[in-house]
A protein has these predicted regions:
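Glycine/small-residue-rich loop that forms an oxyanion/phosphate-binding "nest" at active or ligand-binding sites
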Residues: 78-129
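Short amphipathic alpha-helical segments, especially helix-boundary/capping motifs
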Residues: 3-6, 32-37, 72-76, 91, ...
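FAD-binding core of FAD-dependent oxidoreductases
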Residues: 6, 10-12, 16-23, 86-93, ...
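N-proximal short alpha-helices
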Residues: 3, 86, 101, 146, ...
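Generic, ordered loop/turn and secondary-structure boundary motif
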Residues: 18-25, 48, 81-83, 87, ...
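ATP-dependent small-molecule kinase catalytic core of the GHMP/sugar-kinase superfamily
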Residues: 109-199
């Protein structure tokens, strides 16, 4: 049996829209084991099948490495609320890939893990800090693998999580993001982003 723990993340920090995220101290815990049939527990029944994001990521990783898919049991226990802006999907993606590596004995580098997770998730801003920890500025040059710059977060800072009593999916949240911001707002944000590392 393999146990994997992945931290929640908060992304789109300040001026770092779609690029800057950080790991936070809420966690999702996953166990993986080979099985006779696919079994998924610890999540709503509608996700206890092949459409489960953990399993989809597991299968994608196997395909990336030229491995055949095999039945697996997956148990999920999470502190990370779904669709509340804390990277719940990223925890699933990262765990699925790591579970595939562990059960097949495949050695995966952090760079490879970020690249596969980004391909599944669509962008690296949540998966990169979930893998690397701390704060990460990440971007993907056209036709290239994701690049990540990791920064330690000041220990002087304390974070508060405010979780709304309703779900907000990323696709819906993006619809209300303004396409332009005033220069003064951008300057204000840039001037304060260093506080993340310096406190």
């Amino acid at each position: 049996m393999i146990r994997i723990t992945v931290p929640a993340t908060s992304a789109n920090l300040g001026i770092g829209y779609d690029t800057l995220g950080m790991a936070v101290s809420l966690y999702s815990h996953f166990t993986f084991d080979r099985a006779e049939t696919l079994t998924i527990t610890g999540c709503p029944e509608q996700f206890q099948n092949e459409d489960n994001l953990v399993y989809e990521s597991f299968v994608n990783a196997l395909a990336e490495w030229g491995e055949k898919t095999f039945p697996v049991s997956i148990d999920i226990s999470t502190e990370v609320p779904v669709a509340r802006g804390l990277g719940s999907s990223s925890t699933c993606v990262v765990a699925g890939i790591m579970g595939a590596a562990a059960l097949t004995g495949h050695t995966v580098t952090r760079e490879e893990l970020v690249a596969i997770a980004t391909a599944v998730e669509g962008h690296p801003d949540n998966v990169a800090p979930a893998i690397l920890g701390a704060a990460v500025c990440s971007f993907t040059p056209e036709g290239e693998l994701p690049r990540c710059l990791r920064y330690e977060v000041s220990k002087r800072l304390r974070f508060i999580t405010i979780i709304p009593p309703y779900e907000v999916h990323t696709s819906d949240a993006r619809k209300v993001v303004p396409q332009e911001v005033p220069l003064s707002t951008a300057v204000w944000q840039m001037g304060r982003i260093a506080g993340l590392t310096r406190g």
